[in-house]
């Protein structure tokens, strides 16, 4: 229409990942004891480094999961105004420690 052309050169990429059901089941069971609750899972479309690790683990018959802890919305990520409610840190650490211990003793 305006004589414009474009060339696209792929210089990078990112993937997505999904937390394994076995991990979700354990988190759903353990979260209330840590004062937390599990929201319905969604595919992870962020943290491309974490999704690559997760895919690698899953491709080698391991279980992988990625948990986001609700900590308020005080400015966009990676900005000078970003902040979080630090009250979530202790329950989140408790959940991760409890999850790890539960995986050690299937």
Language model features: what each stretch is:
Residues 1-106:
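Metal-dependent amide/peptide-bond hydrolase catalytic core
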């Amino acid at each position: 229409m305006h004589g414009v052309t474009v060339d696209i050169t792929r210089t990078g990429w990112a993937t997505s990942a999904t937390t394994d059901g076995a991990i979700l089941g354990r988190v759903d069971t353990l979260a209330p004891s840590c004062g937390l609750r599990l929201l319905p899972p969604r595919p992870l479309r962020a943290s491309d480094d974490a999704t690559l690790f997760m895919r690698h683990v899953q491709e080698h018959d391991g279980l992988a999961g990625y948990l986001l802890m609700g900590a308020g919305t005080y400015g966009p990520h990676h900005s000078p105004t970003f902040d979080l409610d630090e009250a979530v840190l202790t329950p989140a650490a408790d959940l991760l420690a409890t999850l790890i211990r539960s995986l050690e003793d299937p």
